[in-house]
Design a protein with these regions (language model features):
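Von Willebrand factor
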Residues: 20-79, 82-123, 125-129, 135-136, 165-171
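Sec-exported extracytoplasmic/periplasmic mature domains
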Residues: 35, 50-58, 96-100, 114-122, ...
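VWA/integrin I-like adhesion module and closely mimicked acidic/polar interface patches used
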Residues: 97, 132-194, 200-202
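Short beta-strand-loop
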Residues: 61-94, 115-119, 139-142, 173-188
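Second-shell loop/turn segments in exported
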Residues: 31-40, 77-81, 94-103, 130-135, ...
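Pro/Ala/Gly-rich low-complexity, hydrophilic intrinsically disordered segments
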Residues: 1-25
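Extracytoplasmic/secreted envelope proteins and their assembly/folding machinery
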Residues: 24, 42, 46-50, 88, ...
Length: 207
């Protein structure tokens, strides 16, 4: 579709689509599987995940885990899922009913992804989908990720971190204060900024 709109001679100059760097060869999804996400934002999450896959027509490997670091496919624990159209469909199909335990904090999943797949010379993007952060310390998370996701000799982080925030509580309970949502946004803005990624805050949870 992009080629049709921009013409067959169009070539991206900086590997950006919609402001998101798409130069990675591997992608990891870290998905909040808490009750609030699964009950109210799941269809929208599936749509966002599919849209993300679409901007990477072919990569060398994919991985899916929840915010606790639980792998969707345990047999691929610590390994890349080969990227084929069939496997992409299986990922989407399995996600529809994937309601595993979650503490509604992306920290464990991000750390597990970096520890398992951080490898020099391997371009990886982590996509975090969530709606709140129930952890204790934002600064501790940032310091830990800084330590795990080290820079190369050009000062670039080896793994990009992107994030999409789903406004579940703002929409379901608009009259209440929701500090964990604000903390999630603050955490992910800082992590994406420091790790070469993009933060997207949605304004709706409808698909």
């Amino acid at each position: 579709e992009q080629k049709r709109l921009l013409g067959s001679q169009y070539k991206p100059q900086n590997n950006l689509i919609g402001g998101i760097p798409v130069d990675s060869e591997y992608i990891i999804f870290v998905i909040d599987t808490s009750g609030s996400m699964f009950s109210y934002a799941w269809e929208r999450m599936l749509r966002e995940l599919q849209a993300t896959l679409n901007i990477y027509p072919r990569v060398k490997g994919i991985q899916v885990m929840n915010d606790m670091g639980t792998y969707m496919f345990s047999r691929y624990r610590g390994q890349w899922i080969p990227d084929t159209p069939g496997r992409r469909k299986v990922i989407i199909d399995n996600l529809r009913n994937w309601a595993v335990f979650s503490n509604s904090s992306p920290v464990e999943g991000i750390e597990a992804a970096i520890r398992a797949f951080h490898k020099p010379g391997q371009k990886v993007s982590i996509y975090v989908f969530g709606d709140d952060f129930s952890g204790d310390s934002i600064s501790h998370v940032i310091d830990t990720v800084d330590r795990l996701n080290r820079s190369n000799d050009r000062g670039e982080r080896l793994m990009r971190i992107h994030a999409v925030a789903f406004p579940v509580y703002f929409i379901m309970e608009p009259a209440k204060q929701h500090p964990n949502i604000i903390r999630f946004a603050a955490l992910m803005r800082e992590l994406t900024h420091r790790n070469g990624g993009t933060f997207v805050g949605l304004n709706d949870i409808r698909p």
